[in-house]
């Protein structure tokens, strides 16, 4: 083949040489999937012929027990937050949240066209205790439930937050739920997000290095106390 492209759960797969005979591509598995994800691969030959393959890719780790979804764990954390985050939203607030969600999605989509900017493994944004893991259930004020699509790190207001890897700052904003946010485009479809900051210390377009300070821990948005919520996206999917 002279050209290979793929698609997995609406996110492009960018193939690159692994060795003289094999190719590899980075992809993501949605949290609600059971035990595998389907990828569609097209191979174009020098003759102009195109072959299509539909691949079912199994998880590298054990799937949840029967009847338990990744998106809905067996137990959930019950949290108390400002009532404005759990009462019925007015139309203006709902529209704001949707605009902010679309901004985050657009950063993920644009990252698919950014070349890979990192060479080192991804690092933790803080060397502190993890207080909540990816995929755990959340119930706010006994009413609003959701899945926690990120990792929370303990921190006091004003403590530093560091970039997980090299990349370009794609978004700095103040969101209703996430508070003050910074999104970094690392290329090859990967974006990391840093939520609830008291003070972002970077601007859109800045190139940041792995371990560079990008902001300060805070308690903005829907929180119970100051901490860092760290998230990652691959294209349209929020990933662990």
Model regions: which residues?
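Cationic-aromatic interfacial patches
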Residues: 1-73
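Surface-exposed, glycine-biased beta-strand/turn segments
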Residues: 54-178
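Catalytic cores of peptidoglycan-degrading enzymes
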Residues: 123-240
């Amino acid at each position: 083949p002279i050209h290979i492209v793929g698609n997995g759960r609406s996110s492009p797969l960018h193939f690159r040489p692994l060795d003289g005979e094999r190719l590899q591509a980075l992809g993501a598995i949605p949290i609600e999937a059971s035990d595998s994800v389907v990828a569609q691969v097209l191979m174009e030959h020098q003759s102009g012929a195109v072959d299509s393959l539909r691949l079912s890719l199994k998880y590298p780790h054990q799937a949840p027990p029967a009847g338990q979804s990744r998106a809905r764990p067996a137990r959930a954390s019950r949290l108390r937050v400002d009532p404005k985050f759990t009462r019925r939203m007015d139309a203006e607030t709902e529209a704001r949240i949707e605009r902010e969600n679309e901004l985050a999605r657009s950063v993920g989509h644009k990252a698919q066209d950014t070349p890979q900017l990192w060479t080192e493994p991804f690092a933790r944004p803080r060397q502190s205790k993890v207080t909540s893991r990816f995929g755990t259930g959340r119930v706010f004020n006994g009413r609003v439930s959701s899945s926690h699509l990120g990792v929370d790190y303990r921190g006091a207001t004003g403590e530093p937050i560091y970039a997980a890897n090299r990349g370009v700052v794609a978004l700095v904003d103040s969101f209703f739920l996430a508070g003050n946010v910074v999104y970094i485009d690392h290329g090859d479809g990967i974006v990391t997000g840093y939520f609830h900051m008291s003070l972002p210390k970077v601007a859109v377009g800045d190139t940041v290095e792995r371990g560079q300070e990008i902001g300060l821990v805070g308690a903005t948005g829907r929180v119970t106390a100051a901490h860092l919520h760290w998230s990652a996206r691959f294209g349209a999917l929020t990933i662990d």
